[in-house]
Amino acid sequence: PILQTLSAFHTALNFMQHGFHWEEHEVLEAIWMNTAQNSIERLCTQCIIHLANANLKHIMKRKTATQKIMKNANALSAEIGRRAPNSVALTEIQKLFLKYAL
């Protein structure tokens, strides 16, 4: 499925905008489990999950965990950029990184 068409995906992004990172993570994990192995949708969802988790760890003042998780998010973003350089997925990830990267 195309992520942007899923109401659950929009719910997760709404949670993110309002600082409900755990809830966002839970919704995205359910989506992630239903994406095709090694697909751009799977990488994109996993990347956003890492952003949510990093923001949660940041709120919890767990600096080392935040840095480690952001490193993983950055690696996934780079992989999306390599595999789908002109994609909507990459554009959306870049927008989220501008708002939520730590």
Language-model features, listed with the residues they occupy:
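Structural register within alpha-helical repeat arrays
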Residues: 11, 46, 51-53
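Start-of-helix signal in alpha-solenoid helical-repeat scaffolds, especially tetratricopeptide repeats
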Residues: 2-5, 40, 45-48
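N-terminal alpha-helical interaction modules that lie
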Residues: 1-36, 74-102
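Alpha-helix boundary/capping segments in eukaryotic regulatory proteins
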Residues: 38-44, 58-65
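Short alpha-helical basic/polar micro-motif
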Residues: 22, 52, 64
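Amphipathic alpha-helical interface segments used for dimerization/assembly
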Residues: 32, 51-55, 70
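TPR/TPR-like (Sel1-like) alpha-helical repeat modules
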Residues: 61-81
